[in-house]
Every structure is written in C-alpha cells, then in structure tokens.
Amino acid sequence: MPAECVNEVSAAKPSDDNAASNQTQSGAAPAEPAASEEPQQKTSSEKLESKEDDAAAKARQRQERFKALQARAKNAAERNLKETAAETQRLATDPALLSSLSRKHAFASHNLLKADTEAAGEDFERKRAWDWTIDESEKWDRRMEKKQRHRDDVAFQDYTQDARKVYKRQLRQMQPDMAAYEREKLAAIEKAAANGDLEIVETNDGEMIAVDKNGTFYSTADTIGFTENKPDRAGVDKLVADLRKAEEVRLKKRRERRGDEEPDVTYINEKNKQFNQKLARFYNKYTTEIRDSFERGTMI
C-alpha cells in the first residue's frame, strides 16, 4: 500500500512538472494584453474628461446666455415702464393748453422786459437787438420783408403777376432728380472723352481732372444739344398730371363765375332757384339728414 502511494506520487510529479512547464511557457503570452489594456483605459478616461469639460463649457455658455436674456428682459421692462409713464403723462396733458400757456408766458415776458427797459430810460429795440448778431438780424429783416411781399401779393393784380405766382409755386413744388443728373453728366463726360474734346490730367496731389481742350464741352448760347433730350416716362406722366390739374382748376373757376357749382339741379327757373336757396338757408340744418337717408335708401 505504501509502495503504491509512492509510485502514484512519483507518477504524479512529472505531470505536475509538465503542467508547470506548460504554464510557464504559455504564461508569457497573457501578460501582454494586461499591458495593452492600460493605454485603452487612459484614452477612455481622457474621453470621459473631455466630454465632462465640453458639458461644463456648454452649461456655462447656457448660463451666460440666460443671464444676458434676463438683463435684456429687465432693461426692456424698465424702458416700457418709463415710456408708459411718459405716454400717460402726455395723454393727460392738453397740447393746446401747453402751447397757449407758453405763448402767454412769452408775451408776458416780452411786455415785462419792455416796461422795465422803458422805465430805465433805454431803447427797448436796441437792447433786444443785443441778443442777435448782425447776420441773424439781417436774415430776420429779409424774412420779414419777404413775408410782407407775399401778403401784398395775394390779391389779384393782373394776369402777368398771376402767371408769375403760378410759375413760382410750380418751381417750389418741383424736386430735382439728382440721380438722373449725375447719370447724364457721366454720359456726357464719357462721350466728350471718347471724341477727344476732354483731356484727363492728373495734378500734383494725385487728383484727376478733366480739361476742356476745345471749349465745346459746356453749353453756350449757340448750343442746341438740349433738343435731343428725351424725358423718361415718370416725367411725362408728371407733366400730364399737372396739365390735367390746371385744366380742372380752370373749369372750377369758370363754374364758380357762372354760378354752376351746384351738382344737383333742384329748380325749374331762376325764381324757383332763389326760393329754394332761401328755404335751404333756414331748413337745411333740419332736412340734411333726411335727404341723405332718402338718397341712401335707408329711410324706407
């Protein structure tokens, strides 16, 4: 029995030695994956850290935007409150009353200053002129003279003066087309330069100027180039509208002179017309609404 055990033990030893040798031979290979797992763990940890940093940065940006929106909302609320208060005060105040009070205050101040100046024995107009320069005083005098001429020019004098007033009014209403002027000017310069009438010269300062060599670029009394001008469609429409407006004014004045201003004929002769006018003077304020209702058909 002991001999068999010894044999079994001795027989088992070689197998253990073989297993150990096999483990030693195969154990070198598993050690390598453990070493390669360390960089993978490092890269995964770096990725996690970068993701956390990105999330933190995005959170900070969202917080900053939220704070900016809060500040804008607060400023908008404050401005709205101020504007609402100003609007309420403006609606509660009568502008006509304010203008009347300011006008009365200016008139009272003027009279008070005039009384004090005359009481001191000084010239009021001379003292008041000290507040203005010579240029301002001359401009004011010219303005007053112009206003006085306009007042005197209102009444009809003769047809020449009437035509002059119409012409000046049309000039005031006319607005120059600077864009079209610049286009035509540029086209004229290019045409003259192509024909050799203009010479482009550079000055010492580097500025480019055009020199008229033949003296034919600018218009003179003998120039007839304006006959080739073709107005645009808008200019033609404006001219037609002005002519129609003048014709309407002329016809309206002729109707007023003839007494044909009434659109509806409600009489059969001149005597009946006078009678209807007399009735209208006394009863129009009572019958206007009734007549309008009959014309609209709402009375029935």
Curated annotation (Swiss-Prot):
GO terms for biological process: mRNA processing; RNA splicing. GO terms for cellular component: catalytic step 2 spliceosome; post-mRNA release spliceosomal complex; Prp19 complex. This is Pre-mRNA-splicing factor syf2. Residues 28-38 have a biased composition (Low complexity). Keywords: Coiled coil, mRNA processing, mRNA splicing, Nucleus, Spliceosome. PANTHER family: GCIP-INTERACTING PROTEIN P29, PRE-MRNA-SPLICING FACTOR SYF2. InterPro entries: mRNA_splic_SYF2 (IPR013260). Residues 55-94 form a coiled coil. The gene is syf2. Associated with the spliceosome. Belongs to the SYF2 family. It comes from Aspergillus fumigatus (strain ATCC MYA-4609 / CBS 101355 / FGSC A1100 / Af293) (Neosartorya fumigata). It is found in: Nucleus. Residues 44-67, 75-85 have a biased composition (Basic and acidic residues). Residues 18-27 have a biased composition (Polar residues).
